[in-house]
């Protein structure tokens, strides 16, 4: 009879967990981002913890979230304005393309270019109108997830230690120290992973500013901030800044556009994403650079925004488990009298 009720209890817990996951799935991006932001803000909270747990959590959350929110919303507004301008003023792009062709010595095909641009922009205008509701839904969900990430970040900073303490009290007493050390290993790995990733994003944003200024790109400080924001999501996101800027410079001056594209790809993408980030973050979190790079790429392809963060965390969890048990084995060998 006891076994029957134990089975019913386990099944009930599984059903509740499955339903919870199902209802939380649309908000998964916000929850995961909130956890990541909490690990980024954790070193800040540790420095100011003397002011109190709640106050330190609020300040640390604000220090991390405020710059990101300002850059994200201002970037979205500017991007929307520029997209509307391009769609309604496609003649400017058309004349820019014709200017590029004339500089390259290609005089033929003017009517063909005009026909292509007019058709492309008419298709864009007609396709945007029916999908306006869908775009509004996605934008609303994005904003909602971002605000959820702020709330999750704050509560993760404020209450995570209490949660771990209560969870530890459920563990059998003879295993509590082992469980506590295991949780600490995971915590250190995740903190090193996401704080290191945040530092690399800041470096990419700072390094991009001289490039934008050198090539006389408008809104250079804003674009540098957006590069930092894009670099928070590794491997893919920088292209959302590099390609539009390259296209703009190509319309202004072909040589400048090609030079920026080449230099931008090498110094703002290949070097930081394929060399600096994997090695730096791998060094701080003790995760192998190749495994980390594959986790970022695979997670993004499979799970979108949340996948970018969940896959490296799974790899980080596996690394923490490996590091913990290798440390335990080494400690056991050192204390073994027969090994002396």
UniProtKB/Swiss-Prot annotation:
Transmembrane regions: 7-27, 57-77, 140-160, 193-213, 225-245, 260-280, 290-310
Tell me where it resides: Cell membrane
Major localisation: membrane
- Tell me which InterPro entries the record gives: AI-2E-like (IPR002549)
Keyword Cell cycle attributed: no
Could you name the domain of life of the organism this protein comes from?
Answer: Archaea
**What membrane topology does the UniProt entry give?**
Multi-pass membrane protein
Its keywords, alphabetically, are: Cell membrane, Membrane, Transmembrane, Transmembrane helix, Transport
One GO cellular component this record assigns the protein to is:
plasma membrane
Protein family (similarity comment) = Belongs to the autoinducer-2 exporter (AI-2E) (TC 2.A.86) family.
Protein name, UniProt field: Putative transport protein AF_1800
Keyword Transmembrane helix attributed: yes
